[in-house]
Amino acid sequence: ENILPIEESGQLRYIDVRGSSDGKLGETQFTGNISVRFVSGHTEAMMLPQIKYKGKTIVYMADLLPSAGHIPLPYVMAYDMFPLTTLHEKKSFLQEALGGDYILFFEHDPVHECCNLQQTERGVRPKDYFKLSAI
């Protein structure tokens, strides 16, 4: 009920988490440079903000990949609500990120703020580590 005045004044914008007509989670575009993708393995409809900056796509990894140590398959967190969904979403995202040369920005990594990716014999792995301020 506390949110009703904000909604009634037109200041509240709901985000449609369904990105396609098939009902799968998708992506919502806010501006030409800012979008949010949705994943549902860790929690339902968790938001991963994506920002295009200086020709790169920076993705805030939230709890899909909380640290660089979670990049290798099949590492997922034991308390994910749907760990098999996380694994599927992670695998798909890593291939997209590798192909698009995305910058991954980690929420919980105590050592590494960001990295890009490379394909190795053992799968997708971090390539270079750097601070967000270096972009």
Predicted regions and their residues:
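Metallo-beta-lactamase
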Residues: 1-38, 88-101
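Short solvent-exposed loop/turn micro-motifs enriched in small/polar/acidic residues
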Residues: 14, 42-44, 110
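Short, catalytically relevant binding-site loops at active-site mouths
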Residues: 19-22, 43-45, 66-67
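Active-site-proximal beta-strand elements of phosphoester/diester hydrolases
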Residues: 33-40, 58-63
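Active-site beta-strand termini and strand-to-loop segments that position acidic
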Residues: 41, 49-54
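Cap/insert and terminal regions of metallo-dependent hydrolase folds
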Residues: 46, 54-135
